[in-house]
């Protein structure tokens, strides 16, 4: 997977207390690139496991309120390695009518790999799809992302995206941990 983002963004700082303070709303320019490679082996029907590695580069510039970074570097390079476990019984991957999707990733970003910030990330996603009538699907999702150690501002958990919690500006709520549930 390759992800690239270069766009003006908004930054409120780190943590809930900064995010709810509208006076913290400030502009900056964000450049982010991620390369993520995983190699999954099928263990049994619908169950996969395998290693993963990723490289992340995040650069923020022209911060209107740089003090909200709390002395963190504006540029972060991060290499992580870990494992992924996936159970996927969905009937159709891009438009499921029934089934389950469970994904657990554990990534480690130690300092001996050249990372300025040493931390680990546990990412768990569980989705359920159930057809309740023709054209009617009940879908639910639980997602949690937990960072332990010292994650940089650009790799913290973000509430709000084009996939989940769409009513929130992406990155307004930025912290080490995240739990979100949606139907």
For each predicted feature, which ranges?
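Gram-negative/organellar outer-membrane beta-barrel architecture
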Residues: 1-78, 82, 161-163, 171-179
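C-terminal outer-membrane beta-barrel translocator/porin domains of Gram-negative envelope proteins
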Residues: 78-182
